[in-house]
Amino acid sequence: MLADKLTPFINRYNELGEMLSSPDITSDIKRMTTLSKERSSLEKIVEKAQEYKSVISQINDTKEMLYDAEMAEMAKEELKELEIQIPILENDIKLLLLPKDPNDDRNIIVELRAGAGGDEAAIFVGNLFEAYTRYADLKDWKVEILSSSPSDAGGYKEIIALIRGEQVYSRLKYEGGTHRVQRVPATESQGRVHTSAITVAVMPEVDDVEIQINENDLKIDVMRSSGCGGQSVNTTDSAVRITHLPTGLVVTNQDQKSQHKNKEKAMKVLKARLYDLEMQEAIAKDSANRSAQVGTGDRSGRIRTYNYPQNRMSDHRITLTLYRLAEIMQGGLMDEIIEPLIADHQSKIVEAAGL
């Protein structure tokens, strides 16, 4: 029973309360801080657990009243109201019992790349990046472009950005995958709909402590920066290309005039890619964990279609279709895509955990 699974949380919460009132703990600031954080992390689930147990107790008491002729009718009404609360509380508790993604609080590095479709794909990279930027503005997040490769036709062949803020990874991790766009290009005289595709990768930002890179594993090349059409935009060798020899990962950055700054940004992207690689390998080795990575793991899969003539956006992972594409691309409706993805993700974890 669910109630039995809640007992250890309540016991630990009470135990921590007693420990925090002990003179031995109050005199040790570091230990007290650690225990306080642990107790605080249990507060929500303990509150729900106590509410759940209270409702069950009230249901049992009310059932006893059914045998009293004078109280039976009133008891039936009370019982209905109480029993309605049980599935709601159980769902709330199950969500609180889910293992937390340790990366959810992190900032992200997001990479958008043009795929099939040539100029149209590059233009859509620009469109989708603008949608993410507008969404970030609504969330009070900060966007910093780390690297970009503009396209002659508009948009970008590739753009890499750092997005900082509260719960960024938890919201945008579902964007990883192939995004397909269907629309009539501006240069199309016959009005035919063209299909193109771009890829999006979303990686948690990591610090130097988490990813240690041996300098001997790096091959660093410097060169002159180039702009659209390949023309030189800098007379100094400021562009940097870093190759991580053990994995073959290559990162290039030329956005800054300073070679040092370009190297710093390239290293930030490389660390994120290495961390992401480790994370994906760990998921692949753990089948139980892999089954829980709904919407975050398969980078090659087509996750979404944007059909401009129909004003339609379809997310293929959860068969979600919205006929409000214009508003979505303005960033204002992004939550209407993300919330159902989170709900689907959580329901699959609940099922996998047997809750």
Swiss-Prot record:
One Pfam family here: RF-1
Disulfide feature: none
Organism (species): Sulfurimonas denitrificans (strain ATCC 33889 / DSM 1251) (Thiomicrospira denitrificans (strain ATCC 33889 / DSM 1251))
This protein's GO CC annotations: cytoplasm
Post-translational modification: Methylated by PrmC. Methylation increases the termination efficiency of RF1.
Record gene name: prfA
Residues found modified as N5-methylglutamine: Q231
Single Gene Ontology MF annotation: translation release factor activity, codon specific
Protein name, as recorded: Peptide chain release factor 1
Role of this protein: Peptide chain release factor 1 directs the termination of translation in response to the peptide chain termination codons UAG and UAA.
